[in-house]
C-alpha cells in the first residue's frame, strides 16, 4: 500500500512539474511577438490631446487644473463645442470680461482635434461619472 501511495505522489509531482516547465517552453517558442493594439482613445493620447486640454474632447474634470475654469466656465466651453480653432473659444456668447481674460491667458493650454465619438457621446463630458 505504501508503494502505491508513493508511486501516486511521485507521478503527481512529475505531472505538476511538467506543467510548469511546459508553460515556459510554450512562451519561449512563440514565433511572432504579440504587438499591442491601440484603440481610438489610446491613439488620440499620443497627439496634443494627451498634453493639453482638447476643447472638443476633454471632459469637465480636465479643467480643474486651471484657476477659475471649473465648473462654470468649463461647462460653457463644453456646451459650445465643437471648435475649429482654439481662438474660437473667445467667441462664446455671454462670457464676462473676467472669463474672457482667463481664456486669453490660458490659450496655450488648449488644443483642438476632431471630435471623437468615443469621448463625446452622451453627456459624459459634463458628468463623466467618476465619483
Curated annotation (Swiss-Prot):
It comes from the Bacteria. Keywords: Electron transport, Membrane, Photosynthesis, Photosystem II, Signal, Thylakoid, Transport. It holds the Pfam family PsbU. The keyword Thylakoid applies. It is found in: Cellular thylakoid membrane. It is a peripheral membrane protein. Residues 29-36 form a propeptide. Residues 1-28 form the signal peptide. Belongs to the PsbU family. PSII is composed of 1 copy each of membrane proteins PsbA, PsbB, PsbC, PsbD, PsbE, PsbF, PsbH, PsbI, PsbJ, PsbK, PsbL, PsbM, PsbT, PsbX, PsbY, PsbZ, Psb30/Ycf12, peripheral proteins PsbO, CyanoQ (PsbQ), PsbU, PsbV and a large number of cofactors. It forms dimeric complexes. This is Photosystem II extrinsic protein U. It comes from Synechocystis sp. (strain ATCC 27184 / PCC 6803 / Kazusa). The gene is psbU.
Amino acid at each position: 500500500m505504501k508503494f502505491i501511495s508513493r508511486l501516486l505522489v511521485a507521478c503527481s509531482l512529475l505531472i505538476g512539474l511538467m506543467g510548469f516547465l511546459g508553460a515556459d517552453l510554450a512562451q519561449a517558442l512563440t514565433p511572432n511577438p504579440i504587438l499591442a493594439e491601440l484603440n481610438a482613445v489610446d491613439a488620440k493620447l499620443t497627439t496634443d490631446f494627451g498634453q493639453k486640454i482638447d476643447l472638443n474632447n476633454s471632459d469637465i474634470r480636465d479643467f480643474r487644473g486651471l484657476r477659475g475654469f471649473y465648473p462654470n466656465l468649463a461647462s460653457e466651453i463644453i456646451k459650445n463645442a465643437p471648435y475649429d480653432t482654439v481662438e474660437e473659444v473667445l467667441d462664446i456668447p455671454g462670457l464676462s470680461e473676467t472669463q474672457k481674460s482667463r481664456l486669453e491667458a490660458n490659450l496655450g493650454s488648449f488644443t483642438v482635434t476632431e471630435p471623437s465619438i468615443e469621448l463625446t457621446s452622451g453627456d459624459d463630458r459634463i458628468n463623466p461619472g467618476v465619483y
